[in-house]
């Protein structure tokens, strides 16, 4: 089965040379006006490969292992508590999670002096591209590609959920790929424990992949939110178009109900809020669309699985474990090669009263685990 894909990056292959600073212990680069200052073991040239709301990413070479790696710079990481917590959360989670379908964190680069710890540089394994870029490209994708992508997403999610963690921000750009189609889940900055019930005010996950219970501000959400996101991604791989590209919350719910039909009273019992139930009941009513007509390129086993993922009531939505056992993935499913995490992840470090300086200290301590401080 030929699964190779071509690399696709937005920023080209521009190589940028560096200059040695701090007595030769660090390389400094100017990347499109962004200062990059990293340990001298990450040798030039480096090349920019991506930018986003939470950082700028460059590829470089680790001179000790001769591997090409990705370095994400989070600028002014401790200027506000929300971003600082996000950075700490992602570092701690990726150190805890060890799975073939979860991106590997390799290093955290510290500045020479603790008082200069303003920007955070996180080193990851390098992947060639992401699913968003592949979907938007002219790269041909067949059903084998789709099966393999979906299987790896679910395999990684099974492990993540078994660690008592919800990703909460699954979308094509957070699914990294290499040229032989190996897939890794990234960006755990919004992750939460499965047992939390408090609604997250900083929740900023991309609206298009957001489950109905989140759109309706349900305070008690479960791992089913990630399954909904996977369903949206599954359909997007097949059609090369976002499934529910809502312009706002109201439009998002309208697009959802136009496809899967307006929920009946029994499907709203998961909503504790009487106001939320009343709101949904007063929305325009839509019948359920025929999925075979809506997705003519999908075979019957793919449609069967998609329908089970896109269920309004999270209680009735298929679980990751059940999805892995579905006929659509039977050629890939192997229970003995779908590991779970041996230990639950604890978010105990997230003290709401923590200051930016206290969070900075915790991130500094994380960096020490990768690079112990020199003994005096």
Swiss-Prot record:
It catalyses: L-seryl-[protein] + ATP = O-phospho-L-seryl-[protein] + ADP + H(+); L-threonyl-[protein] + ATP = O-phospho-L-threonyl-[protein] + ADP + H(+). GO terms for molecular function: ATP binding; MAP kinase activity; protein serine kinase activity. InterPro entries: Kinase-like_dom_sf, MAP_kinase, MAP_kinase_CS, Prot_kinase_dom, Protein_kinase_ATP_BS, Ser/Thr_kinase_AS. Residues 43-329 form the Protein kinase domain. ATP binds at residues 49-57, 72. A motif (TXY) lies at residues 201-203. The active site is at residue 169. Activated by threonine and tyrosine phosphorylation. Activated by the MAP kinase kinase MKK2. Activated by the MAP kinase kinase MKK6 in vitro. It comes from the Eukaryota. Its EC number is 2.7.11.24. PROSITE patterns: MAPK, PROTEIN_KINASE_ATP, PROTEIN_KINASE_DOM, PROTEIN_KINASE_ST. The modification Phosphothreonine is found at residues 201, 206. Autophosphorylated on threonine and tyrosine residues. Dually phosphorylated on Thr-201 and Tyr-203, which activates the enzyme. Keywords: ATP-binding, Kinase, Nucleotide-binding, Phosphoprotein, Serine/threonine-protein kinase, Transferase. Belongs to the protein kinase superfamily. CMGC Ser/Thr protein kinase family. MAP kinase subfamily. This is Mitogen-activated protein kinase 5. The gene is MPK5.
């Amino acid at each position: 089965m030929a699964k190779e894909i071509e690399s696709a990056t937005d920023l080209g292959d521009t190589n940028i040379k560096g200059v040695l600073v701090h007595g030769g212990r660090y390389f400094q680069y100017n990347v499109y006006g962004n200062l990059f200052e990293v340990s001298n073991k990450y040798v030039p040239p480096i090349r920019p490969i991506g930018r986003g709301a939470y950082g700028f990413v460059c590829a470089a070479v680790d001179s000790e292992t001769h591997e090409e790696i990705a370095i994400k710079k989070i600028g002014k990481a401790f200027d506000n508590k929300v971003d600082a917590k996000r950075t700490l959360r992602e570092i701690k989670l990726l150190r805890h999670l060890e799975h073939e379908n979860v991106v590997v964190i390799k290093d955290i680069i510290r500045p020479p002096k603790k008082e200069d710890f303003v920007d955070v540089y996180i080193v990851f394994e390098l992947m060639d591209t992401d699913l968003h870029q592949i979907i938007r490209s002219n790269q041909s994708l067949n059903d084998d590609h789709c099966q393999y992508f979906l299987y790896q997403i679910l395999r990684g999610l099974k492990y993540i959920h078994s660690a008592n963690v919800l990703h909460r921000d699954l979308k094509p750009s957070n699914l990294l790929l290499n040229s032989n189609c190996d897939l890794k889940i990234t960006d755990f900055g919004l992750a939460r424990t499965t047992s939390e019930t408090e609604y997250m005010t900083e929740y900023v996950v991309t609206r298009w992949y957001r489950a109905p219970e989140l759109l309706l501000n349900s305070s008690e959400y479960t791992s089913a939110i990630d399954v909904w996101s996977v369903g949206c991604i599954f359909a997007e791989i097949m059609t090369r178009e976002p499934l529910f590209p809502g312009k706002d919350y109201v439009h998002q719910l309208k697009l959802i109900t136009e496809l899967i039909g307006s929920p009946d009273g029994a499907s709203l019992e998961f909503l504790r809020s009487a106001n939320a139930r009343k709101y949904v009941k007063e929305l325009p009513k839509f019948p359920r669309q025929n999925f075979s007509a809506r997705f003519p390129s999908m075979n019957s086993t793919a449609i069967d699985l998609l329908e089970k993922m896109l269920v309004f009531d999270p209680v009735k939505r298929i679980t990751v474990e059940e999805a892995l056992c579905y006929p659509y993935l039977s050629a890939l499913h192997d229970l003995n090669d779908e590991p779970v995490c041996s230990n639950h992840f604890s978010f105990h470090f997230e003290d709401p009263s923590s200051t930016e300086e206290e969070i900075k200290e915790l991130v500094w301590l994380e960096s020490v685990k990768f690079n112990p401080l020199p003994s005096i």
